[in-house]
Amino acid sequence: PKTDEFFTYGETLWDHVKDLPHGYCHGDMYDGNIHKTPDGKFYVLDFDTSCEGFPMYDLALICNKTHYFGFNESGDGKSKEVLSRFLPGYMKHITLNQTEANAFYDLIALYHFALQATIIEMYGPHCVDNAFLDEQLDWLYKWWAQCAKETRT
């Protein structure tokens, strides 16, 4: 695999997000971990990755509509659409600065990057091969290129 490229990508990504405000972070706040009861109450599950982190990371994961195994150009637009619907209610309770808002796309990339490490940690290095890792790096490059207009113009 293109290990050096993964390392460089990860370091660059980290440089973009490392100075974001820190606070409580669930760490796995995708819609599968949010359940609505018949009486309309919401419950958040799966706290094994909660930590001191970037609260904006949870917001990015809630709004993330990309597909891990294959890049789909509509993932950007769908994620942005969910963010635009979710953000007004969120902002009634939590203030975001512009740096946090601009980190949205980088945090989705960070989640994608982290999922690879989680899969290998859980199932061992034999569960992926070089072609799979190269495809994941390609996904990250495509995502970065597509989102560059939004955050780095």
Question: Each PLM stretch: what is its role?
Answer:
Residues 23, 43-45, 55:
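Protein kinase-like catalytic core scaffold
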Residues 1-27, 37-39:
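An alpha-helical support segment within catalytic cores of ATP-dependent transferases
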Residues 56-94, 111-126:
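Active-site activation/catalytic loop segments of kinase-like enzymes and analogous catalytic loops
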Residues 28, 46:
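Conserved catalytic-loop position in the HRD/HxD motif
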Residues 115-153:
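ATP/Mg2+ or Mg2+-diphosphate-binding catalytic cores
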Residues 96-108:
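All-alpha amphipathic helical-bundle segments outside canonical DNA-binding/catalytic cores
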